[in-house]
Amino acid sequence: MGSEDNQENYQLRYYIALSAPPTRTVADGREAFMRPEPGFNPSWFHKHCGVDFSRRWHTDVKYRLQCHEAMSKEVRRRFPGSNIGGIDDGAAPDLLTGLYGIAVVPAMFGSSIQYFCDKWPQPQPEPLTDEQADVLSPPNLRDNEFFQGILGQLDQIEKVTGAARGYLNWQGVLNTAFRLRGDKIFTDLFDNRQRAHHIFECVAATMIDGTKLLHDRQRQAGVDEKFATISNCVVNMISPEQYSDHLLRYDLKIRGEFDKFGIHNCAWVVDPYMDAYATVPRLGYLDMGITSDLKRARKLFPATRRNVLYTSIDLANKSDEQIRNDFEHIAADFAPCDVGLPDIEIDVPDSRLMFAMDLCKEFSDRYGDN
C-alpha cells in the first residue's frame, strides 16, 4: 500500500497536450479535488482546424508549431477560460508530447509507421518469428536513427519555443511486447516463458535507457524530469496471477530507476490487478474505469494521485442525470482525483464537455472540504 507521507513529492497527474495521446506530468499539490483533464482526438482538430496529422506533423517542428497555434485558438474560442491542454499556463508550447504516438518504442526496434490525416500513427511491425524473438536485443539508442531524429527535433523545439518540454509515449512492457511479437507473446507465457521474458527484458531496458537519455537532453535546457510512467492497456489479456508472476517485476524494475512513477491502467475495471499494483513503492499515479471498485481503490492507494477515465462514448450517450450521478459517485467514493476526459470525438457537443467540467467544479466545492 502506498505511503501517505510527502504525497505531493511523488504524485503525478493526468496530462493531455493538444491533439496528443494522454500521458502524465508532475503534480504540484494544488490540484482541485476533482480536476478535469479533457483531450480531443486528432479527428476533432482535423475537422475544426484543418490540421493534417500525417507524417509532416511528426517530422516538421515549425509545422507542428503552426498547428499548435491554430488548435489553441480554436480551443480558446470554444472553451474560454478552461485552460484545456494547459494552453493558458504561460508555458512554452509543448511540441514534443504526441510525437509518433504509441509507435515510439516499436520504431526504435525497426518497425515502420503508418500515418493518418486524422488519427494518431500506428506501428506496423512484422511479428517477430521464434528465431527473431530469441535473438532480439535492445537497440543502441545512441546510434539509433529514429531516436536520434527525435533528439534532433528537440533541438529545433528548443530553438523555436525557448524550451524543451514534453514527453514521449513509452507505452508499457506488455503493450510493446504484444506489438512486436503479436498474439504469440501470450502463448509464449505458457509454451516458452524464457522467450517471453527475453522480449520483456529487451523492452524494459529500452524504455529505461530511452527515458534517461531524453531526460539528459532536456536537463541541458533546464527541464529536469525525474519520472517514468507505463501503460498497461493490454494487461487484462493476461490473468492477475500472470501479471504478478511475469510482468510486475519489469514494472518494478522501471519504477526503481526513477524518482517518481505512475501506471496507466486504461478505462476498464482495475479490480483484479489492484493488489499487485499496491506493491509498487510510492506509486504516484493510477487510473481506471468508472466501473472499478472506486472505494477500494481509494483505500488501497491513499497517497497515489488517482484518475477515473470517463469515456467519450459515455460523455456523448449518457443523459445529464446519468453523468451527474457518475460524477457524484466519483466525488463521494474516489476523490481527490483527476477526472480524465480523453479521446473526445466530433460527436461530443461542446456543451456536454462544459457540463462535465462544471460538475467537477460543483462537486469539488461540495465535497472538497469534507
At which residue positions do the language-model features occur?
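A gly/proline- and charged-residue-enriched helix-loop-helix capping module
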Residues: 117-152
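Short coil/loop linkers at secondary-structure junctions
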Residues: 52, 103, 112-114, 164
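Aromatic- and acidic-residue-enriched carbohydrate-binding clefts of CAZyme catalytic domains
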Residues: 112-131, 230-237, 309
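Membrane helical hairpin/interfacial module
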Residues: 57-110
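Active-site loop segments of alpha/beta catalytic cores
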Residues: 1-58, 64, 139-370
